[in-house]
Amino acid sequence: GIGYEPSISITSNGNMFITAHKDLRWGGEDSPIPIILDPDDPGPWWACTDGRETTWDYWASWFWASYDNGTTWGHGENFGPTPGNMLFANYLAGGSECLGDEGDISVDAMDTVYYLDTTLEDNWWHTLVDHGTEYSTGVCQRMNTMAADDRPWVAAQGDGIIHYLGNSGASPPECTGDSGRYWYYHSEDGGNTFSQCYAVPGGWSTISSQRHGSYVYIAQENADTQSGTVTVRISDEYGRGTGFGDGTWGAPIDVGPREGNCPEGYPVVNNNEGGTVAVVWADCPNGSTGPWEIRFAISYDYGTNWSTWNVSHINGIQMYPFVSISDEDLVSLAFYGLDFDDGGLDGDYVEGEEWFLYAGALQTPVEGDSWDFKIADPEPLHVVTAYEEQSGDVHALHDFFETVLSPDGTWFGIAYQQNL
């Protein structure tokens, strides 16, 4: 499918699920222009209709599943085709009829898969039980969020405890008086109801939780500023409480500096069941088209003590680093990289430079260790264009990608973007 910004999650038996943002330009001619504005268009939101320029199978954001360690992939359970448009379509197609823009996926301790798909104005929830093989949600279950959302982050744990961070991009009036671009929503009934009103003070953020334990972590920029620090907020009681000034959330802990303001360079947090938690982020001390740095912070005691160091691998742009951790403390890192020294071109960020996917894994890293990164896909993800060189545009691979480690820690899967 044509899409970008993929998210990936894995169940305890190795079933994997990917969602990706759909490119609306591939929705068909004039899509999604309402019929009243374009009489020769039978309606908006076209999906896989003969003679139209589209790869869409359905209206929801992409949702793919693999039940054989990633060897083969297909659409997730109950995500059948919805050919046509919003006026003439298959309304018996299940979850795929719920129009979406982009989403996120998480898995709880019961191996229930939770897929959130945002419509920007609100969100749909899709729940799949039995390692993600059985769709169990009523069609188009609406979340009823209080604020518009541009990017959802989801973490699940226990039996139906769900944490959702919504990027509202602003601080709308809310109940606790906190201010922040992200809002936190909490559910303990599998997403049927959510708490409201809680903004998370700070800048760009991500969230992770233990599946079987009680710990939840939010990594964030301390503020929406050019430079500052990366902080971690911790709850050891499933994120319960009435806000970030009380309840079970501790005060933010500084884990490292931020230098420059990388495009969508938010910190990514992940953890395991044994008390290890790590954060990775990109820094841009030389501007968006100069050499970037990757910083990494890790704690082996539930976030009490931290070690932080620079783990940069190339002289170039190191974008959107992502971290995964096994229960045996195998730590994988991956990033999109553009090496200024590998092409013999005249200049750094210039037309013809190639982006590649880099990945590596390290057992129980300590301060000063280096990952032996390799190019994971020999095919370039993207080649810099003349326009991108002239405008300093480094956004060709969009905002992020994700990885997972297998349950036994012997392999890891990467959901990433490759431009056509």
For each of these PLM feature ranges, what is it?
Residues 1-420:
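Extracellular, repeat-based ectodomains that mediate carbohydrate processing or recognition
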